[in-house]
Amino acid sequence: MTLVYMNMALAFTISLLGLLMYRSHLMSSLLCLEGMMLSLFVTMAVTILNSHLILANMIPIILLVFAACEAALGLSLLVMVSNTYGVDHVQNLNLLQC
């Protein structure tokens, strides 16, 4: 395993542990999810560049599109929870029912 892959696996693991440990605030959960998506993007881009797959060059860009959609939905949910309850605790997400 090269140094780049080991660093990206470590970054993904640290982000996953952060997501599992700091679940009380929505903002910290969103930051950990973004760290996971960024490490996946770099890993996929390096893998595709090393294997010289021309047709697979679009896959990391599609992952970035999904990451941007996830960030936009997460931030809009954060704004809605903050405006409704005044805090960004994940516990309040169960109370947001129609």
From Swiss-Prot:
Chief subcellular location: mitochondrion
Domain of life from the UniProt record: Eukaryota
Any Pfam family: Oxidored_q2
Database matches in InterPro entries: NADH_UbQ_OxRdtase_chain4L/K, NUOK/Mnh_C1-like
Keyword vocabulary terms for this entry: Electron transport, Membrane, Mitochondrion, Mitochondrion inner membrane, NAD, Respiratory chain, Translocase, Transmembrane, Transmembrane helix, Transport, Ubiquinone
Subcellular location: Mitochondrion inner membrane
Gene3D superfamilies for this protein: 1.10.287.3510
Any one of the GO CC terms: mitochondrial inner membrane
Transmembrane segments: 1-21, 29-49, 61-81
Its membrane topology: Multi-pass membrane protein
S-S pairs: none
GO terms, molecular function: NADH dehydrogenase (ubiquinone) activity
Known catalytic reactions: a ubiquinone + NADH + 5 H(+)(in) = a ubiquinol + NAD(+) + 4 H(+)(out)
GO biological process terms on file: ATP synthesis coupled electron transport
EC number(s) from the headed UniProt entry: 7.1.1.2
Subunit field text: Core subunit of respiratory chain NADH dehydrogenase (Complex I) which is composed of 45 different subunits.
Family: Belongs to the complex I subunit 4L family.
Reported function: Core subunit of the mitochondrial membrane respiratory chain NADH dehydrogenase (Complex I) which catalyzes electron transfer from NADH through the respiratory chain, using ubiquinone as an electron acceptor. Part of the enzyme membrane arm which is embedded in the lipid bilayer and involved in proton translocation.
UniProt protein name: NADH-ubiquinone oxidoreductase chain 4L
Species annotation: Rousettus aegyptiacus
Lineage: Eukaryota, Metazoa, Chordata, Craniata, Vertebrata
Gene that this polypeptide is encoded by: MT-ND4L
